[in-house]
Amino acid sequence: MNNLTSTKFIFVTGGVVSSLGKGLAAASIGALLQARGFKICLRKLDPYLNIDPGTMSPIQHGEVFVTDDGAETDLDLGHYERFTGVKTTKNDNITTGKVYHNLLNKERKGDYLGQTVQIIPHVTDLINSFILHNTDALDFVICEIGGTVGDIESQPFLESIRQIGYKLSKNNTVFVHLTLVPYISATMELKTKPTQHSVKELSSVGIQPDIILYRSKIPLSQEQRDKIANLCNVSPTNIIPALDVKNIYELPISYHQYNLDTQILKHFNITSPEPNLDKWENILNISHVSTKTITIAIIGKYIKLLDAYKSLIEALEHAAIHNKTKLSIHWIDSRSLNNEITNTFDNVHAILIPGGFGDDGVEGKIIAIQYARINNIPFLGICMGMQLAIIEFARNVIHLEDANSTEFNFYCKNPVIHQLPELQQNLGGSMKLGSHPCYLKVDSKIFSIYKEQVINERRRHRYTVNLQYKDLLESHGLIFTGHSHHNNNDSLAEVIELKNHPWFIGVQFHPEFKSDPFQSHPLFMSFIQASLNYQETKRHKIS
């Protein structure tokens, strides 16, 4: 580790349009500094008024990423963990809603002693406290500011980082601004005007960017970089391309090739050995040697925005890479499935039902589960996916035709899935969240996958298996092979398997939150291997 005299702060903002890749840029900066031996952490400041994204629609917001300590956070924290291996916490993501919630609680308790509570200094002070909290042992803190410069919601956050930049001075802060340089194909031109306007907007709140990352298909010419440098008051060497890549794990190497980490350290007047990027080069080399292709069907209802399944997609990609396999995902809207599925699954090698909420599309998922069970197709059910596998089995094997979850039918006669009693409160913040130990049966497929009797996985659910049906389900071949302890040492079902099926597993937890490109999660590794085995078996039958 490098011993710096003080912690350095890197602020990443975005302009022109949203979804440019600020989170990936921040994660890449973290990975590059980490590869040089520095101790880093990453934080995200979200400008929306929700306290957290837990009750936001995945179609609007994307995935809710869950941390070990049970925080429901922005999906960018998933990128942070996958790129750096540094576990994020509830202290690494804040929203405008959380700031105001804390502010009003303090005001009601009399903490402000009769002061007129205002945006400046009271709101900005709380944001500053979040950014600066528990950073003394770190070399670098990388803070991503959500949204786009110019959004009214972002103004308190921008004012806060301006204040920190002023108080800590240029020697301890750097401002990185990500913009878009659109390419006009009709005239074959790159347009720099949006970047100029974005920097002007940022400057209007008192922040002068030190480095400009420009998102583009191709690099700017030296003349174009000089133009931006002159108009935006940024050195030409600090105008760095954020080029489109086929694989997001190319980004750290790409940014290093264009000297992003070098220029950041130069700004701070820090000398450092070159980064060790061997693991990044290795993962890219492995990803290019795929010899087979498998197709996995994912049945969900949020498929209009694939960011709703971001960690799941990445976990499958990690496992495919380490199995030297190219992954093809066949996305199926669960609401489109009915009993006439005919050729829907003819060319798939596995079926996966991810987590979700609500009864919309549930019957389509159950149809897919039945198809996987009957036809011996590898199946993985996650969270609701596991619960629906139990409902399908209860209905179609045990013939409890009205078996259901109380989430979908509160008055059903056979509630094989029901709500945890202590969670029948508010919708927001009312789930079993975060990492908990799970105890596996030794004589089970899940144990052979993990090779550990006690595992720790992250949860996000408020419904669980009704264990009054456990003996009945097991007597027909659906086996419970993992459990966790609950209030008063009660058990919660965590893993199910089908006794007479090559690979049929349901898990209540979310394994996708703990996968990374360098060490694929064992459950997804096994799932991909099962898919390859099924593909091979199917090929032999055809031949």
Curated annotation (Swiss-Prot):
It comes from the Bacteria. Residues 295-537 form the Glutamine amidotransferase type-1 domain. GO terms for molecular function: ATP binding; CTP synthase activity; glutaminase activity; identical protein binding; metal ion binding. Belongs to the CTP synthase family. CDD domains: CTPS_N (cd03113), GATase1_CTP_Synthase (cd01746). It catalyses: UTP + L-glutamine + ATP + H2O = CTP + L-glutamate + ADP + phosphate + 2 H(+); L-glutamine + H2O = L-glutamate + NH4(+); UTP + NH4(+) + ATP = CTP + ADP + phosphate + 2 H(+). This is CTP synthase. Mg(2+) binds at residues 76, 144. The keyword Transmembrane helix does not apply. The keyword Kinase does not apply. InterPro entries: Class_I_gatase-like, CTP_synthase, CTP_synthase_N, GATASE, GATase1_CTP_Synthase, P-loop_NTPase. CTP binds at residues 18, 151-153, 191-196, 227. One of its GO terms (biological process) is pyrimidine nucleobase biosynthetic process. Pathway: Pyrimidine metabolism; CTP biosynthesis via de novo pathway; CTP from UDP: step 2/2. UTP binds at residues 18, 191-196, 227. The gene is pyrG. It comes from Ehrlichia ruminantium (strain Gardel). Residues 1-270 are annotated as: Amidoligase domain. ATP binds at residues 19-24, 76. The active site is at 383 (nucleophile), 510, 512. Its EC number is 6.3.4.2. CTPSs have evolved a hybrid strategy for distinguishing between UTP and CTP. The overlapping regions of the product feedback inhibitory and substrate sites recognize a common feature in both compounds, the triphosphate moiety. To differentiate isosteric substrate and product pyrimidine rings, an additional pocket far from the expected kinase/ligase catalytic site, specifically recognizes the cytosine and ribose portions of the product inhibitor. It is an enzyme of class 6 (ligase). L-glutamine binds at residues 356, 384-387, 407, 462.
